[in-house]
Regions:
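Ligand-binding clefts of soluble mixed alpha/beta catalytic domains
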Residues: 1-429
């Protein structure tokens, strides 16, 4: 029932090559989408520019790229890759909000295997160079991978169900079908007492947000729709519904790299936050992060520059922002991940939360290094110092008493708290 604008390339006609006339047709449709405030969906299946038209074909690409840029943040743009996309033609999908690739059928690359072989001597096949799996897990270009064209269209429809038609509207709200105060006692034991043990944050996300009946009464279906699932798995982002309303969900993933922030995770989070803010989607963030990934690879790769993108994204976001600290919230990572200090509206902490400049063990080793070297039983004394540090500086109750978090809540009551907070913030200006 949603209005959308669609442009499709037909590979059976001259390989779907991009001509001056095709450019005019696609640009006209995109202009209409912008003017009417409806999402734009591009079905890409083309060998690239129509060489025999010379520079006119390139001019057509330029006109399309310009319109993709003008539409950014105004209407949602989705690219569905159903075949090849090579050379300059990749920049139009690259400028859109979401890319859905079809496994085994679609390939994206700027320079093909033959050119790479000639210039660099490197042998690489199409799938390794620019296949769906490569772009979904390595480059991060693809947000979704479909098994075939039918699934690609199904993903497109599901994605559109979470998105507003334009930046002046709110996402479609569904009649609530789940109990807004539904408690889930299983969440109270989700986080292991040992901070070195991992858990899957998806288990919390799928239980907290709206569920609807599945094929089995004992197995409800979660409304959580993950985006970029294969890229930077140490962070989880996606859409969900909370009492019928669409929210953007961001979370560290302790089950992968302890949920640490690295370059790829920073880019993944920042881009998603900015998209949600642009299309009036409230943000809910779950924090369990020991910090930023150390090492020369990350430092030389620009972790400072990429990490700053998260600060910028959350700081400029004007939509309702709610944060839940589930366990570790250390140092700069705590600050950038929707903390109170960058104007998050509501911050909750589970009793397992540990909010501090750094982990208790590391802090004790620095603060009491000389004293530990002098005692006869350093392990016992260190354990005592660690316990004292956690209670005095890392306890969520200490953070709540100081106003750094708004409340310490039981994990089982998280859903009720989030529903109430979102209802309170609905008319946030």
């Amino acid at each position: 029932g949603r209005k959308v604008a669609v442009a499709a390339q037909d590979f059976t006609v001259i390989g779907g090559s991009f001509s001056e006339a095709q450019a005019q047709k696609v640009c006209k449709v995109l202009d209409m989408a912008i003017g009417s405030g409806v999402p734009f969906v591009a079905l890409n299946d083309s060998v690239g520019a129509r060489i025999q038209e010379g520079v006119w074909s390139l001019a057509g690409y330029s006109e399309l790229f310009w319109r993709n840029t003008q539409a950014s943040g105004v209407i949602p743009q989705i690219s569905v890759m159903l075949g090849p996309c090579a050379g300059g033609s990749v920049y139009s999908p690259g400028l859109t909000d979401f890319i859905i690739m079809t496994a085994g059928l679609s390939h994206m690359f700027i320079t093909g295997p033959q050119v790479i072989k000639t210039v660099t001597g490197e042998d690489v096949d199409l799938e390794t160079l620019g296949g769906a799996q490569t772009h979904a897990s390595v480059s991060g270009v693809a947000h979704f991978v479909a098994a075939d064209e039918d699934e690609a269209f199904s993903i497109t429809r599901k994605l559109l169900s979470y998105l507003s038609s334009n930046n002046a509207e709110s996402p479609p709200r569904l009649p609530p079908t789940d109990d807004p105060v539904r408690a889930d006692p299983a969440l109270d034991t989700l986080v292991p007492p040992d901070g070195s043990q991992s858990y899957d944050i998806r288990h919390a996300i799928t239980r907290i947000f709206d569920q609807h009946p599945g094929q089995s009464p004992t197995e409800p279906v979660s409304s959580f729709f993950e985006v970029h699932a294969r890229f930077a798995p140490n962070a989880v982002v996606g859409f969900a519904r909370l009492h019928g309303e669409v929210v953007g969900v961001i979370a560290n993933q302790p089950a992968h790299m302890a949920g640490v922030l690295d370059i790829n995770a920073s880019d993944k989070i920042a881009r998603f936050v900015r998209f949600c803010d642009g299309f009036n989607i409230p943000l809910v963030t779950f924090v369990d992060c020991p910090g930023f990934m150390p090492g020369t690879v990350q430092e030389h790769g620009g972790i400072i520059r990429h990490g700053a993108k998260i600060v910028y994204a959350y700081s400029e976001a004007t939509v309702p922002k709610i944060c839940v600290v589930t366990r570790k919230a250390y140092g700069g990572a705590y600050i950038v991940l929707s903390s109170k200090y960058i104007r998050t509206d509501m911050v909750y902490a589970w009793p397992t939360a540990e909010i501090a400049v750094m982990g208790a063990e590391g802090a004790v080793n620095i603060l009491y290094r000389k004293r530990l070297a002098e005692v006869e039983n350093p392990d016992q004394v260190q354990a005592q110092f660690v316990a004292e540090f956690r209670e005095q500086f890392g306890s969520p109750y200490a953070a709540a008493a100081s106003g750094h978090v708004d409340d310490v809540i039981l994990p089982s009551e998280t859903r009720a708290k989030l529903v109430a907070a979102l209802d309170f913030l609905r008319d946030k200006q």
